Amino acid sequence: SLVELGKMILQETGKNPVTYGAY
């Protein structure tokens, strides 16, 4: 799902909550 993908990206960056907000 896009939400899980967003969480995965958020964990990798760790400094970009805006990325998670996009999902």
Swiss-Prot record:
Homodimer; non-covalently linked (probable alternative/compact dimer conformation in solution). Keywords: Blood coagulation cascade inhibiting toxin, Hemostasis impairing toxin, Myotoxin, Secreted, Toxin. The keyword Secreted applies. GO terms for cellular component: extracellular region. This is Phospholipase A2 homolog 4. One of its GO terms (molecular function) is toxin activity. It is found in: Secreted. Belongs to the phospholipase A2 family. Group II subfamily. K49 sub-subfamily. It comes from the Eukaryota. It comes from Bothrops asper (Terciopelo). Expressed by the venom gland. Snake venom phospholipase A2 homolog that lacks enzymatic activity. Induces acute muscle damage after intramuscular injection in mice and disrupts negatively charged liposomes but not positively charged ones. Also exerts a weak anticoagulant effect only at concentrations of 40 ug/ml or higher. A model of myotoxic mechanism has been proposed: an apo Lys49-PLA2 is activated by the entrance of a hydrophobic molecule (e.g. fatty acid) at the hydrophobic channel of the protein leading to a reorientation of a monomer.
